[in-house]
């Protein structure tokens, strides 16, 4: 019995040396979060009513609205910068359409080591490149592309500036809302 105990004591001390290694594990969950800072944008044209018979409703300054798009993305695909944010609209008022441009200057100025690989505005939406405003439809359109693991910061002034403009495209389909508002939905989807 004594011999067994002595042998065990020597085998335990034989595992130690002047260099020791330890295995560690790191677990990070993949995540994809997108947020538009203003949850609701209202295009109020009640002050744009014509004052002279025979004059049309002409959309005034309220036809232009802005907000910011923020996101956080942790890729699950080995670091390929293939994340995207797409945009679509449903239930837009008949007789109208909405256009969108995006400005990514602020996001492009962020430190890559701190914020990660932020995406670029797709060229057809890029306000900084002189793009024409894109008409939003019910079909997803890529707005931000080449997103790596990154985050934009949270709130107004962070991320990407979104610039909406409302347009009349068929006057015959317009109708008065009598104080209520027609509701449409703009959907942003982040994916990799």
State what each model feature region is.
Residues 14-133, 140-192:
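N-terminal small/polar-rich segments of proteins
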Residues 8-14:
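Sec/Tat signal peptide C-region and signal peptidase I cleavage site
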Residues 1-7:
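Bacterial N-terminal signal peptides
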């Amino acid at each position: 019995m004594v011999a067994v105990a002595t042998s065990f004591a020597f085998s335990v001390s034989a595992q130690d040396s002047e260099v020791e290694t330890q295995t560690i594990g790191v677990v990070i969950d993949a995540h994809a979060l997108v947020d538009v800072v203003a949850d609701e944008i209202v295009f109020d044209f009640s002050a744009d009513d014509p004052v002279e018979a025979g004059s049309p409703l002409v959309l005034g300054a309220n036809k232009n609205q802005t907000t910011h798009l923020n996101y956080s993305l942790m890729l699950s695909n080995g670091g390929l910068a293939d994340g995207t944010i797409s945009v679509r609209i449903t239930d837009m008022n008949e007789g109208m359409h909405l256009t969108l441009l995006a400005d990514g200057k602020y996001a492009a100025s962020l430190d890559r080591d701190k914020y990660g690989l932020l995406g670029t505005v797709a060229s057809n939406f890029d306000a900084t490149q002189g793009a024409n405003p894109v008409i939003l439809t019910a079909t997803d359109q890529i707005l931000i592309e080449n997103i790596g693991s990154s985050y934009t910061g949270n709130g107004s002034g962070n991320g990407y500036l979104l610039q909406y403009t409302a347009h009349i495209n068929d006057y015959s389909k317009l109708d008065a809302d009598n104080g209520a508002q027609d509701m449409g939905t703009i959907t942003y989807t982040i994916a990799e």
